[in-house]
């Protein structure tokens, strides 16, 4: 019985390795990374109108992926709100939600508006292009449209400010 289990585990491992390798080949080059040109997108916002990344051409832009059920995202909201209040006019902060309904997000944003732009990536198409694997995730895009930072986890107001200032050239 132990030989059978051992052979089965080896087969599963081999199939898994081939599956991972195949997936890597298929998805290679299909997402952006630090140092790449940011993928331009057009997504709906809270009022239903569309916002494009190119609307912010020539500005340092911060993208933050979040979810309403995400505890670290909720902890991060006061820091994001403080950044938006203190630096949002100079460095736009765009909040992107993937896969949740507008009604659900409206409940969250009522407490955390602070003039932030909230966008909806319903089918996670843009999230996949940006290689978003969780939330919160933050991207800093420089004035030339290049992704300069990709950070997984909650951020602070000062982290955001320091990144934005660093790429404000």
Where are these regions (language model features)?
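Short loop/turn microsegments at loop-to-beta-strand junctions
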Residues: 38-39, 61, 135-136, 151
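Thiol-/selenol-based redox modules, centered on thioredoxin-like
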Residues: 140-169
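Conserved hydrophobic packing residues within short motifs/helices of P-loop NTPase cores
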Residues: 61-63, 94-96
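Short, internal strand/loop/helix patches
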Residues: 94, 106-144
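Conserved redox-active cysteine motifs that mediate thiol-disulfide chemistry
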Residues: 57, 65-82
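A short beta-strand-turn-helix
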Residues: 40-61
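N-terminal targeting signals for export/organelle localization
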Residues: 1-40
């Amino acid at each position: 019985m132990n030989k059978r289990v051992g052979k089965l585990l080896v087969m599963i491992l081999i199939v898994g390795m081939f599956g991972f390798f195949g997936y890597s080949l298929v998805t290679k080059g299909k997402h952006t990374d630090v140092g790449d040109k940011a993928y331009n997108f057009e997504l709906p916002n809270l009022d239903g109108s569309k916002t494009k990344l190119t609307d912010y051409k020539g500005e340092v832009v911060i993208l933050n992926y979040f979810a309403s059920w995400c505890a670290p995202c909720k902890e991060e909201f006061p820091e994001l709100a403080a950044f938006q209040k203190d630096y949002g006019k100079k460095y736009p902060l765009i909040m992107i939600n993937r896969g949740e309904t507008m009604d659900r997000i409206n409940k969250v944003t009522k407490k955390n508006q602070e003039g932030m732009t909230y966008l909806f990536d319903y089918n996670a198409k843009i999230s996949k292009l940006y290689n978003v694997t969780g939330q919160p995730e933050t991207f800093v895009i420089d004035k030339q449209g290049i992704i300069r930072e990709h950070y997984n986890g909650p951020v602070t107001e000062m982290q955001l400010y320091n990144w934005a200032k660093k790429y404000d050239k």
